[in-house]
């Protein structure tokens, strides 16, 4: 019995040493195999210029090998040279075609049978080795039909759970500075709030569920980070070797067999019993049970799998990253802090009584988050789609079946054509604009970090309320600063075209004198 199986219930996250050693082995294996095996990468037969960092006469595999280390530079280079047309990027596992945002209107409403967003996400996130399911839209339907319409009545539950979470996760720091690792704190706060809505009160405060959902998140992104630089034809060799990938399988089985699977069976039995006193739980898990359309969607293991993946990928990690980015920005640009605090205290004099309308009214906070995301987007590319049948665009550009397309959302957000003085961080840039367009969740042809069109991130509305609730309390109740060794804003970590905050930075926090929790 291996170590991971023996410690199933602990749902361990592989250590940096394990993954560091594995990365060295993987690198050596890749270089060896790349030279001895003809590389069957997916090349796209599209008549557009290819953009590389190196001399075009050098071997192509060099550009593919170094893409993950140079992606941002190459993407910006391509955008500067070809922003009104399409260009090709050479990734380790194949070509990707970056389209101009002038094509947005003709592409955004095309059906999945023409442009498939789920398949593109599956490819981009190495789905076969990160356990992503792409065979159903159940979770999207539940979000659109049950979760988003219910946000108003769910806010009190979120606030209640976060009140408990702050008491548990934040240290005692009245009259003294205490060191915390903000990303880890925010990760657990988001996980707690999400769990209250997704799995209900019986699970949301159990350490087993919190550990499972958080560590599953970490292992997904560790696996993606390690496999993205590797050509896909090597994934079957390298993938099973990764400790993070093996941990994902172990964690998933644990959630299916020990946590959510039995809960689903129990709920169905209670409902079938005809007990007049039984009330179905009002949570995401139950909504998935109710809306499942066939035996496969309704299988307890598949429901557990889909819910765990959704909370990990779409709620926990992304929200924690946004809050961490925002905190780093406010520490280094403190002039925006007091106006934000003033708005929050005026809108929510009693945070525990926060409502849907009070959170929506935080226009400065919305604008700040939008500007922080513009400078620190989740990735330089978005609007990922896989072409499912040959497509000819309005200007005659032909996209053959199988082409992976995207748009350069990062460079678009830094283009003077769309943003005045784009290199200046203006936290309240969007406050005086159109009310809908100024919201953090708003998407457009010039703001695509949540995607665009019918397949834009459906969970962004719920996630935004959670992160605004967390950040509004944190800003008002705490002072914060970097330690003496941290000069300036911590540099983001660039993982190919993806951007994440430095998650290993520590921050000093202290309870503010006269803050609501101490008054």
From Swiss-Prot:
Induction: The onset of expression occurs at 60-hour-old stationary cultures and the steady-state levels correlates with the onset of aflatrem biosynthesis at 108 hours. Pathway: Secondary metabolite biosynthesis. It comes from the Eukaryota. The chain crosses the membrane at residues 21-41. Keywords: Heme, Iron, Membrane, Metal-binding, Monooxygenase, Oxidoreductase, Transmembrane, Transmembrane helix. SUPFAM superfamilies: Cytochrome P450 (SSF48264). The keyword Ribosomal protein does not apply. Belongs to the cytochrome P450 family. This is Cytochrome P450 monooxygenase AtmP. It comes from Aspergillus flavus.
């Amino acid at each position: 019995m291996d170590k991971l199986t023996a410690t199933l219930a602990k749902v361990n996250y592989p250590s940096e040493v394990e993954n560091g050693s594995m990365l060295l082995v993987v690198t050596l294996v890749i270089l060896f195999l790349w030279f001895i095996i003809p590389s069957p990468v997916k090349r796209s037969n599209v008549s557009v210029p290819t953009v590389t960092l190196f001399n075009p006469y050098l071997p192509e595999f060099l550009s593919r090998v170094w893409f993950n280390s140079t992606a941002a530079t190459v993407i910006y280079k391509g955008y500067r040279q070809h922003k009104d047309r399409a260009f090709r990027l050479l990734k380790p596992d194949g070509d990707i075609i970056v389209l101009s945002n002038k094509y947005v209107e003709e592409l955004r409403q095309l059906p999945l049978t023409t442009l498939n967003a789920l398949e593109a996400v599956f490819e981009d996130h190495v789905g076969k080795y990160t356990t992503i399911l792409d065979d159903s839209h159940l979770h999207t339907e539940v979000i659109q039909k049950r979760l988003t319409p219910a946000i108003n009545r769910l806010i009190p539950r979120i606030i209640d759970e976060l009140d408990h979470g702050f008491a548990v996760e934040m240290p005692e720091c009245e009259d003294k500075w205490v060191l915390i690792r903000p990303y880890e704190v925010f990760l657990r706060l988001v996980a707690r709030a999400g769990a209250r809505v997704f799995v209900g009160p019986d699970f949301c405060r159990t350490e087993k569920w919190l550990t499972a959902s958080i560590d599953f998140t970490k292992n997904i992104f560790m696996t993606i980070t390690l496999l993205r630089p590797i050509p896909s034809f090597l994934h079957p060799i390298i993938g099973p070797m990764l400790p993070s990938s093996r941990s994902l399988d172990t964690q998933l089985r644990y959630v299916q067999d020990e946590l959510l699977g039995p809960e689903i069976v129990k709920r169905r039995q209670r409902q079938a019993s005809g007990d007049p006193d039984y009330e179905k739980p009002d949570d995401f898990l139950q909504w998935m049970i109710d809306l499942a359309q066939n035996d496969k969607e309704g299988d307890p293991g598949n429901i557990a799998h889909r819910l765990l993946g959704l909370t990990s990928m779409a709620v926990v990690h992304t929200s924690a990253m946004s809050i961490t980015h925002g905190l780093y920005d406010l520490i280094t640009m403190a002039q925006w802090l007091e106006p934000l605090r003033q708005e929050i205290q005026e809108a929510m004099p009693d945070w525990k009584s926060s409502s849907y309308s009070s959170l929506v009214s935080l226009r400065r906070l919305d604008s700040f988050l939008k500007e922080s995301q513009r400078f620190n987007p989740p990735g330089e590319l978005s609007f990922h789609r896989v072409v499912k049948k040959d497509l000819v665009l309005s200007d005659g550009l032909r996209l053959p079946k199988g082409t992976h397309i995207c748009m350069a959302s990062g460079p678009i957000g830094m283009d003077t054509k769309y943003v005045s003085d784009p290199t200046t961080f203006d936290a309240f840039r969007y406050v005086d604009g159109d009310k809908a367009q100024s919201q953090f969740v708003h998407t457009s042809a010039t703001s695509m970090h949540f995607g665009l069109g019918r397949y834009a991130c459906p969970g962004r509305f719920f996630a935004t309320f959670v992160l605004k609730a967390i950040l509004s309390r944190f800003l008002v109740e705490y002072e914060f600063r970097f330690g003496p060794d941290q000069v300036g804003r911590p540099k983001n970590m660039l993982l190919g075209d993806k951007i994440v905050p430095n998650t290993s930075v520590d921050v000093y926090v202290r309870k503010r004198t006269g803050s609501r929790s101490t008054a």
